[in-house]
Amino acid sequence: MTSRGRARASDRRARGAVVASGKIDFTDAGCFELPYAPVAEALLPEGPWKVVEGGVCAAKGFKVAGYKAGLRAKGTRADCALIVADEDATCAGIFTTNIMCAAPVTYCKKQLAGKPTARALLINAAQANAATGDQGAADAQATAEELSKSLGVAEEDILLMSTGVIGKRIKLDKLMPAIPILSANVESSTAAANAAATAICTTDLVRKTVAIEVQIGGKTVCMGGMAKGSGMIHPNMATMLGVVTCDADVTPEVWRNITSRAGAASFNQISVDGDTSTNDSLVCFASGKAGNAKITSVDSAEGKLLEQALTAVCRGLAKAIAWDGEGATCLIECNVSGAADDEDARVIARSVVCSSLAKAAIFGHDPNWGRLACAAGYAAPVKNRFDQNDLKLSLGPHQLMDKGQPLDFDAVAASRYLKEVTGVHGTCVVDISVGNGSGRGQAWGCDLSYDYVKINAEYTT
């Protein structure tokens, strides 16, 4: 290739893999190079669904695109994504509980409070647009207005997400010219879905996508999701963005209810480092294109099955985020049983996966039952405190405690279990029973390694 040819190739990469025809090449390795591991698929709970291809394009009625606008300080990876519904889609969202919420979070909450449908979601990486004051809000408004013009849809049908460095405003000089290109290139393909899932990532090591189909009311309903997140992950929404598309026909009230419950049982049950971010958002769309009879009750058989499917997708994505925790060598799954109710069980499970001492012990292959029991004991807020004499605790196949006291277990074998799990980036299972109640709960986290400190000492958030 001549020097001029190399320059032209380089220029194409710099412009986000747009070829001469104006089409984005979603297979361009320079922009969409983030590797994929089928973690979310592998971590899906069992159920009456099957995994399919397509990511957020698996559901009927949606088109997507990813693009490199030049928002990142370095590197060639794409940095913005667009999801567009063919028609008004029922929409629900849950957002960060951090008081310092970002401008796009405030914008989305206002939009969804005004109407239960949306047409498009624009996501940018690199700049979080958090702690940016009135100008940050104006920037969000400006991007929504530009997207509204490009797509020919009402501004109130636009939603926004941002992720990246807190305190940094969006580079409008880069993003605004990219919006018409994104709008012109949305398509319903696996390649486009993968490109979008890659574009939204920051410190993630893998892109996170999953899609399933399930029979509801005699019709095939498809549901796909993508998420990003690796650090600043903590219950009640963390530095994670999640998007789910679904083609079920469902009322806004039912969709809001099951989105809230699915989020509570998934994304709000993960922790990497105990930091709750400014930007966390989960937005779920339902196009109604599956042809099923409209689901009008959460208590109907169809409503329950739809909730199970949405929870499964959200759990697969949430667990993939914890698996990909910064510096992590394993996923930690804590299962709690015997609590007074499910919420108490969830609180206890969250407490265990949030414990820095427990996480460090697992990284060091130390079957330290004391740290695990301690974390269960200080869990708060719980409505009903358990009796310490009822505590049973197991690490994988090794029971470490019974009736609140340590057992004479094989410490070498238990340590070997941890070494084997971390050696293959597998799942370390912690089972805890706190009594005879009916409450059950799960939470997911990851171990705490030297690399976590290194990554966050070198990366500005």
UniProtKB/Swiss-Prot annotation:
Keywords: Acyltransferase, Amino-acid biosynthesis, Arginine biosynthesis, Autocatalytic cleavage, Chloroplast, Multifunctional enzyme, Plastid, Transferase. InterPro entries: Arg_biosynth_ArgJ (IPR002813), ArgJ-like_dom_sf (IPR016117), ArgJ_beta_C (IPR042195). The record marks A238, T239 as: Cleavage. Its EC number is 2.3.1.35, 2.3.1.1. Pathway: Amino-acid biosynthesis; L-arginine biosynthesis; L-ornithine and N-acetyl-L-glutamate from L-glutamate and N(2)-acetyl-L-ornithine (cyclic): step 1/1; Amino-acid biosynthesis; L-arginine biosynthesis; N(2)-acetyl-L-ornithine from L-glutamate: step 1/4. GO terms for biological process: L-arginine biosynthetic process; ornithine biosynthetic process. Gene3D superfamilies: arginine biosynthesis bifunctional protein suprefamily (3.30.2330.10), ArgJ beta chain, C-terminal domain (3.10.20.340), L-amino peptidase D-ALA esterase/amidase (3.60.70.12). It catalyses: N(2)-acetyl-L-ornithine + L-glutamate = N-acetyl-L-glutamate + L-ornithine; L-glutamate + acetyl-CoA = N-acetyl-L-glutamate + CoA + H(+). It comes from the Eukaryota. It is an enzyme of class 2 (transferase). Disulfide bonds: none annotated. GO terms for cellular component: chloroplast. It is found in: Plastid, Chloroplast. The record marks T163, G164 as: Involved in the stabilization of negative charge on the oxyanion by the formation of the oxyanion hole. The keyword Translocase does not apply. GO terms for molecular function: glutamate N-acetyltransferase activity; L-glutamate N-acetyltransferase activity. Substrate binds at T202, K228, T239, E326, N456, T461. The active site is at T239 (nucleophile). Heterodimer of an alpha and a beta chain. Belongs to the ArgJ family. Catalyzes two activities which are involved in the cyclic version of arginine biosynthesis: the synthesis of acetylglutamate from glutamate and acetyl-CoA, and of ornithine by transacetylation between acetylornithine and glutamate. This protein may be expected to contain an N-terminal transit peptide but none has been predicted. This is Arginine biosynthesis bifunctional protein ArgJ, chloroplastic. It comes from Ostreococcus lucimarinus (strain CCE9901). The lineage of its organism: Eukaryota, Viridiplantae, Chlorophyta, Mamiellophyceae, Mamiellales.
